[in-house]
Each structure stands twice: as structure tokens, then as C-alpha cells.
């Protein structure tokens, strides 16, 4: 998969491909990340990418010409990409959106800045995506988040089992995790995790995953499609809750 990020601050976003599993994926040719500087597609000596808004109002608007020149270049060089604009007006990023984006051969993320982008640039945009109901100074951080989330669904970037166990993968939050030592400050690792009984461990993990989801994200719990393991885990959880309530 090829992911491109179009920004006026390339040094800001280049770190996304320099660390961790994404850097390994790039090194192993599982993922190609291209970072483009929008200023390289300007025609004036000052490389200006913004201008005053028609009709007045505060702030500046990103000019359309550099975008038109960029997409002419990109389409000739690589082929037409699936284009995402980072925007507080967009759909909120989630696992389903990330999985869909990971199936694209070429993904291009535009980092918005200033008051916004000239509306005529929207002819190139397939989808607007937000990472939450708040406003940032620019789209670089959301672009990095989108890149990170999408990359996890590319085969080989992380182990498939790790992805399946992530929070939200099946509309459930992740179960608790423990490592050594077995005891710290009187806090013990649950005995079931030391038992070696993989069936009981899986059941305990699912139970705790359901407990977390009910407590923290009941909206996800209500969307979840329950399997037989879920039903057994819920029965255990309800028994524990009834016992604790007495």
C-alpha cells in the first residue's frame, strides 16, 4: 500500500515513518509512505499557499492552484489515489473506516490548515475524516493518526492476532494485561493467567473485556455481535456482579 501525506510542514509528519512498527513496515516494503510539501507546487517565489477569503471574514484560506498542480503531478506519477481530507467536519475515525482505507492501493491524506481549503479543491476529495469533536491548528496530527491506524490493518505490519485483540476490533474494549513481577505492592496477577489453561484464560479475558466495555463504552456493548464464548463469559460476569452486590 502507498500512503501519501500532503502538508505544508513535511518535517512535522516525517517522523511517522521513522519509528516503531511503521518504520519496520516501510523497511520491509509492506508500506510506502510519501510526504509531499504543498509549497513545492506553488509558482511564486515566496511559495504562498494561502490568501484572503472572498466575502471577508477572519483567517486565511488555502489557495486552490497548488492542489490542482499537485494532483496533476500525483496522478501522472502514481495513478489516481483515494483522497482523504482531515477535517473537523468529517466522519469520526474508527476501526471500520480504517479497515476500509487499508484496502486502497493508494491513499492520499490532505492536511488542512488556516480557516480551511478553497471549496473547489473538494473535487479531488473522496472522504473527510475527523479524529474527534475538537479543532486542531492543522491536519498533520490527524494525518499521522490515520496513517498509524490504517497501517495496522495492512497484512504483515503487525501480527494478525494482535489486531484481533485490540480494543474496538469486535466492538469490545481490550482485556487487562499483566507482566512480571507476579506481585507488586500487594497487587497480584490473577491466578487464572498463571494456570496454563488456555480455554479458561480466553474465557477470563473475554469476561474482563465485556466488563470494561459495559462500564466504559455501553454504546459499543449494545452493537456487539455475541458468540458462544461471549455468552459463557457474560454468565460468569453476571454471577460475579450478583455475588459482589450481596
From Swiss-Prot:
CDD domains: TrmD-like (cd18080). It is an enzyme of class 2 (transferase). Its EC number is 2.1.1.228. GO terms for cellular component: cytosol. It catalyses: guanosine(37) in tRNA + S-adenosyl-L-methionine = N(1)-methylguanosine(37) in tRNA + S-adenosyl-L-homocysteine + H(+). One of its GO terms (molecular function) is tRNA (guanine(37)-N1)-methyltransferase activity. It comes from the Bacteria. Keywords: Cytoplasm, Methyltransferase, S-adenosyl-L-methionine, Transferase, tRNA processing. SUPFAM superfamilies: alpha/beta knot. Pfam families: tRNA_m1G_MT. It is found in: Cytoplasm. One of its GO terms (biological process) is tRNA N1-guanine methylation. S-adenosyl-L-methionine binds at residues 112, 131-136. Specifically methylates guanosine-37 in various tRNAs. Homodimer. Belongs to the RNA methyltransferase TrmD family. This is tRNA (guanine-N(1)-)-methyltransferase. It comes from Fervidobacterium nodosum (strain ATCC 35602 / DSM 5306 / Rt17-B1). The lineage of its organism: Bacteria, Thermotogati, Thermotogota, Thermotogae, Thermotogales.
